[in-house]
Amino acid sequence: MSKAKNVEEFIAAQRAAIAANPDCGNSHYNLAVALIGLQKYDEAEKALKEAIHCSPTLAEAYVQLGGICLQRGDLDGCLAYNQQAIQSRAGFAEGWGNIGFVQLQKGEIDKAIEALEKATKWNPNFIQAYATLANAYLMKGMVDKSIDVNLKVLQLEPSFALAHNNLAIAYLEKGEYEMAAEHCAKAVELGYEVAPEILKEVDEHKK
C-alpha cells in the first residue's frame, strides 16, 4: 500500500471519528497534521481552529497554526500563536523555541535569547533551540557563549552539521584558524553547504 493511500485512509478515519464525536479535539488535530503533510494548509488551519475550540489547552495546535503562518511568511501571526501555546501550557519548550526563532528573524536578538534560554531550560535536549540560541549569541557578539552552546549541540548530536558550520564561523572570529578549519571540514563532510566566503577565509589561513 502506498504512503499516499495510507495518508488518505488516515484522513478518512479522522473525518469519521469527528462525525461520530465532533467535540474531540485530538481528532481535529490529527486530521490537521495529516492535511499539513499534504500541504493543504487552508483545510488544516480550519481543523486546527476546531481542535482549539474543542480543547483550548492543546498547545500543539497553536504551534501548528504558527507553522502555517510561517509557511505564508507571516512572522507576527506565527509569534502570536506560539505565545498562545506557552500560555496554554506552562513550560512548553517548543513554543518558546519558536518564539525565539521568530524574534531572531525580526532582529529582536535580546528577546530571542531570552526565549531560547527558556526553551532549553524546559527541554535540555532541544537541539534546534540550542542551535538557534548559539546563532543569536554570535549575532550579539557573545562568541564564547556561542561556542559553548554549539559544543553542547554536538554532545547531543555529533553529526549536526549546522553546529560545525557555526563553530567554524565563531572560531574564525576568535582567530582560532585551526579549529575553524577542523569544524568547516566536518560541516562539509556532513553535507552542509558552507558559505563560499567562509571556505575562502578558512583556506587563506591554512598553513
Placement of each model-derived feature along the sequence:
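Ankyrin-repeat and related helical/solenoid repeat scaffolds used for protein-protein interactions
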Residues: 125-189, 193
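Non-membrane alpha-helical segments in proteins
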Residues: 26-37, 60-67, 71
